[in-house]
């Protein structure tokens, strides 16, 4: 027994009576019909009979406990118009006549917001009418007995209860015209059972999942349930979705309302309409779901019912697009989307918030058709989705993306997975947007692309394993004036997006994934390795800067200069890019000594004038050099090797293809060398107006020599492979090791600065043991350098180049040493 507790009884006249009782039954006995008995928190070890029209209200469902002590039904209701609310009811003991709460022939009763466990029939309506069972939590623990059982009852409602771990979750037996709606039924043997002739019941909007035997069952031996309407339920991961041995029930609410969601349904949604033969998606499967041999769900849902809800109107929808299209959905509303796979193309043209339940499990999949999610309004927020499988077409920009933000401002895209699209996230002429905490991976073109879109904020996005991870394109500073911090990464390396930097050096940094320089002066970029981006290095309005020894691979553009002047792009390797090096609206730059190729364009100039392209090797591209509306550029000493179109000019004039002495090497050039100087006898025709007057007959190479603190260049044109080059400062000797195929002839055309060697020059091959077939040591001299030319038969050779005015004693020693060495070799 417990000590007396203070109960508050409010009678039908509104009078408050505070009185002490040692049991709930004592308080019931004292109360008048129509009273409300408020029960204070405690554990009451008793079984009670409610035989009056009263409301029995517990102070707190967790702490107001009625324990039946395993002796039988805990709360027995035998009067009409009784309310039981706010209790924990437990320990009825086992037996088919034992319940947690039972109404016996009692009508118009309400059982709400109670907790029941360790009872056989947790809640049982027995021969009752017009009762309401809602908001109760039933968790039996050991899967014994029934959760909620309706026996020979009519016009009752069972709503929004949680029912778990029973033999049967919700059970009908000879009951009719009842409504079961919005319940959560899980981890039972059977989710919902219909026995005997239970008919004309409405079972809707329940979630029935993870039940070990089946979602619903109609056992034949107990009669034939008929004319029940069952729709908008979600049957998820039950061992058997449904077991039935009769027919005559209705499994959908017609079109377009739809039927039920079946997790085992494997149909598709490409069509709509009552006959599912009209083009378009509607969230309903295109084929029926066979419930049994006799019955079918004609309009199975593609996602659990209620997954898409307008939080402002509380309306539910079958597709995200139908929620957006609804006239009840207006600017400022929030649409919440539950976990599931939504096969649709979403167009957000209202100022809405789309909120996914979980970014890993709330999936919008367009089945490789078109753009997955398009934003065509301002002030749209999209958060918490996986967005995947756009189409793969390459039409006008804007089609076939994961997320396409089109001419929109004030939008936010956050906490999304964006994968396996043509373009992951695409901002198109869109400003003042925030893109943050997204994981963008495995997209077939760009991971994240900004096209003429400025004043956007990108924060903490992980961009990886896309063909081109990040690309920012535009035409003016306003397009590039974005805030993109180092919290963004490409393939695990930080993005460096810098505006207004001066006198900075970026050298040997392994933690740079991509480098954007906007409005910068006197910046040096050196020894970086950059791959798979829209640009490796991008410069907008950058002056007096230098980019050297950068390796930029597999990007849309390796190195890109836009509206930039007075820069040097030197000795970089740009391979397997769409364009190796591009100059757009950029003048008076030097592009020298770079290796570019294996792409569509090696070097591209677009409206770029007065630039110098020298000593670059451009190979294996569709276009070696391409000029569009670019004028007065100097292009020489470049090696154009096996490009499909070596040079292509569109509306470009006054460009010079040689320096007045030497031009470029063209691997497809057919030419002769009658005067033996390493240059073709005939000009190389580029088009009717452009010619290389002095085409090189083989590859051009330049070797830098550091002499007394200054850099001098030794320039070599040779059809031999140069294995090594050395200049000996103390002896003024140049040494080369070369080779070439046996039984062929090689040549060298070499330009030697006078500072490194007196203009009168001699050449020895293999210490004089290999014959020089032809020589001309005074091909040309401009007062600063001497050009020489000589030929030989190919093998592996050491070539020594010396000045004829080398100190006489030194020359004599060299000749004697060479003679003695030759004699010794003969003696051997």
Predicted segments, located by residue:
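Secretory targeting signatures
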Residues: 1-10, 27, 56, 84, ...
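Acidic Gly/Asp/Thr-rich repetitive segments characteristic of extracellular carbohydrate-active
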Residues: 7-49, 306-343, 347
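Short, T/G/N/S-enriched strand-turn elements that build extracellular solenoid repeat scaffolds
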Residues: 24-31, 44-51, 56, 77, ...
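N-terminal extracellular ligand-recognition/capping segment immediately after the signal peptide
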Residues: 34-55, 59-71, 240, 247, ...
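Right-handed parallel beta-helix/beta-spiral solenoid domain characteristic of secreted/periplasmic
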Residues: 54-97, 315, 351-401, 490-512, ...
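Extracellular beta-strand/beta-solenoid scaffold signature
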Residues: 67-75, 94-103, 118-126, 140-151, ...
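Consensus "Asn ladder" position of solenoid repeat domains
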Residues: 87, 114, 136, 161, ...
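Surface-exposed beta-strand/loop patches in extracellular or lumenal glycoproteins
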Residues: 739-759
């Amino acid at each position: 027994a417990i000590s007396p507790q203070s109960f508050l009884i409010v009678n039908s006249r509104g009078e408050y009576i505070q009185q002490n009782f040692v049991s709930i039954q004592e308080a019931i006995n004292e109360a008048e019909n129509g009273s409300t008995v408020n029960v204070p928190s405690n554990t009451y070890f008793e079984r009670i009979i409610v035989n009056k029209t009263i409301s029995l209200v517990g102070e707190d469902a967790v702490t107001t406990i009625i324990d039946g002590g395993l002796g039988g039904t805990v709360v027995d209701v035998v009067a009409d118009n009784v309310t039981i609310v706010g209790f924990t009811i437990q320990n009825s003991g086992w037996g088919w006549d034992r319940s947690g709460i039972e109404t016996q022939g009692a009508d118009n009763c309400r059982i709400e917001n109670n907790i029941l466990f360790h009872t056989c029939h947790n809640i049982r309506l027995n021969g009752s009418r017009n009762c309401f069972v809602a908001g109760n939590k039933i968790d039996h623990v050991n899967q014994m007995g029934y959760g909620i059982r309706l026996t020979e009852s009519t016009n009752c409602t069972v709503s929004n209860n949680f029912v778990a771990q029973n033999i049967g979750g919700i059970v009908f037996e000879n009951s009719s015209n009842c409504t079961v709606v919005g319940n959560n039924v899980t981890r039972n043997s059977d989710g919902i059972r219909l026995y005997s002739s239970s008919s004309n019941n409405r079972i809707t909007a329940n979630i029935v999942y993870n039940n070990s035997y089946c979602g619903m069952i109609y056992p034949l031996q107990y009669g034939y349930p008929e004319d029940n309407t069952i729709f908008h339920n979600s049957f998820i991961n039950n061992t058997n979705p449904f077991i039935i041995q009769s027919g005559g029930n209705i499994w959908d609410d017609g079109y377009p309302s739809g039927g039920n969601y079946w997790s085992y349904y494997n149909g598709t949604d490409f069509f709509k309409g009552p006959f599912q033969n009209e083009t378009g998606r509607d969230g309903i499967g295109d084929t029926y779901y066979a419930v049994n041999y006799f019955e079918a769900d004609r309009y199975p849902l593609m996602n659990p019912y209620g997954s898409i809800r307008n939080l402002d109107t509380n309306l539910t929808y079958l597709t995200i697009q139908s929620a957006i299209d609804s006239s009840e959905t207006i600017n400022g509303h929030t649409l919440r989307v539950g976990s599931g796979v939504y096969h649709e193309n979403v167009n957000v043209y209202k100022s809405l918030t789309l909120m996914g339940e979980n970014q890993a499990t709330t999936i919008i999949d367009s089945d490789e058709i078109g753009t997955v999610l398009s934003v065509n309004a301002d002030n749209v927020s999209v958060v918490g989705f996986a967005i995947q499988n756009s189409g793969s077409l390459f039409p006008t920009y804007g089609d076939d993306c994961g997320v396409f933000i089109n001419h929109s401002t004030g939008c936010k895209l956050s906490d999304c997975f964006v994968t396996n699209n043509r373009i992951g996230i695409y901002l198109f002429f869109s400003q003042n947007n925030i893109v943050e905490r997204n994981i963008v991976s495995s997209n077939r073109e760009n991971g994240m692309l900004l096209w003429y879109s400025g004043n956007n904020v990108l924060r903490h996005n992980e961009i990886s394993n896309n063909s081109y991870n990040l690309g920012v394109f535009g035409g003016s500073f306003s397009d590039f004036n974005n805030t993109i911090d180092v919290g963004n990464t490409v393939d695990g390396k930080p993005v460096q997006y810098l505006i207004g930097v001066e006198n900075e050096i970026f050298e040997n940094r392994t933690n740079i994934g991509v480098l954007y320089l906007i409005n910068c002066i006197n910046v040096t970029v050196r020894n970086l390795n950059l791959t798979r981006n829209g640009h490796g290095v991008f410069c907008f309005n950058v002056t007096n800067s230098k980019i050297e020894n950068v390796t930029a691979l597999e990007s849309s553009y390796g190195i890109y200069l836009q509206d930039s002047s007075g820069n040097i792009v030197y000795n970089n390797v740009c391979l397997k890019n769409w364009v190796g090096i591009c100059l757009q609206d950029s003048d008076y730059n030097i592009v020298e000594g770079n290796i570019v190729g294996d792409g569509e364009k090696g070097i591209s100039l677009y409206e770029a004038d007065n630039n110098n392209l020298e000593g670059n090797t451009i190979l294996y591209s569709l276009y070696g050099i391409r000029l569009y509306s670019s004028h007065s550029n100097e292009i020489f000493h470049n090696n154009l090797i096996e490009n499909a179109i070596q040079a292509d000019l569109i509306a470009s004039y006054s460009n010079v293809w040689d320096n007045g002495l030497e031009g470029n090497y063209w691997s497809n050039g057919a030419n002769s060398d009658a005067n033996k100087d390493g240059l073709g006898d005939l000009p190389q025709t580029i088009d009717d107006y452009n010619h290389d007057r002095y085409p090189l007959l083989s590859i051009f190479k330049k070797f830098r020599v550091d002499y007394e603190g200054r850099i001098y260049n030794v320039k070599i044109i040779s059809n031999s492979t140069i294995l090594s080059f050395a200049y000996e400062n103390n002896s003024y000797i140049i040494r080369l090791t070369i080779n070439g195929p046996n039984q062929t002839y090689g040549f060298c055309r070499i330009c030697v600065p006078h500072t490194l060697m007196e203009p009168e020059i001699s050449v020895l091959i293999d210490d004089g043991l290999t014959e020089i077939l032809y020589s001309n040591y005074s091909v040309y001299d401009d007062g600063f350098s001497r050009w020489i030319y000589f030929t030989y038969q190919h093998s592996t050779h050491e070539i020594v180049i010396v000045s004829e005015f080398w100190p006489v004693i030194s020359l004599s020693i060299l000749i004697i040493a060479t003679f003695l060495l030759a004699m010794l070799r003969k003696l051997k």
